[in-house]
Amino acid sequence: LGRNKGAVMIAEESTAWPKVTGSPEDGGLGFSLKWNMGWMHDFTEYMKLDPYFRKNAHNMMTFASSYAYSENYILVLSHDEVVHLKCSMINKMPGLGFDKYANLKAGYAFMMGHPGKKLLFMGQEFAQLREWSEERELDWYLLAEPEHQAIQNWYRDLLHLYKKNKAMYELDNDPAGFEWVNADDCFRSIYSFIRHSKDNKKNLLFVLNFTPMERRDYRVGVPRRKQCRL
């Protein structure tokens, strides 16, 4: 499995069966990647919460880092999450109007920065309102609306950031590629972490605020004295 160059074998698997992405020579199943179902569940449940109550569920966004290297994972927001009355991604978000779109932007940024490859189901990159159905095309007309175009532009910018910076992907399966700066600021629902590159020269610092509260003069530490660019 997965021996042909350019071919990727991905397992949609939700049990604790070990070595799904391990080599067959070592008793594994030989898949290239495995869906991270635990991350998907925790992420969507957290994002649905009113920001006021997120402080009580802070660990839902940090728990996946404790097992992120047990397999070669892909972070998935699949068709399963936007059908059968589960709502589209934008309609999972709490609040009204601007708050919904701001929540979705923060969620997508967290997903892009988290270790693991990425898979987002079609339509969610421009905040499709209706659930997906195989009986109709996507609601492309929504892109005439500024808020939907803004989400598409945001996701495009995240993809460009991902492609441009090796720290976002080259150590996905190595604990050396990810470091929490502050995983415990539950009262303000802020997460900060660093993605490291192999040469440890072009690292990226993520600071994500999951409340609508503006935080002025928020201090973030870095692990060593280096020049940083915002």
Language-model segments: residues:
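Catalytic cores of secreted or luminal carbohydrate-active enzymes
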Residues: P146-D172
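Segments forming glycine/polar-rich beta-alpha architectures that bind adenosine-containing cofactors
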Residues: L230
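Conserved alpha/beta catalytic core and glycan-binding cleft of carbohydrate-active enzymes
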Residues: L1-E134, K163-N173, G177-Q227
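Active-site His/acidic residue clusters
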Residues: W132-L142
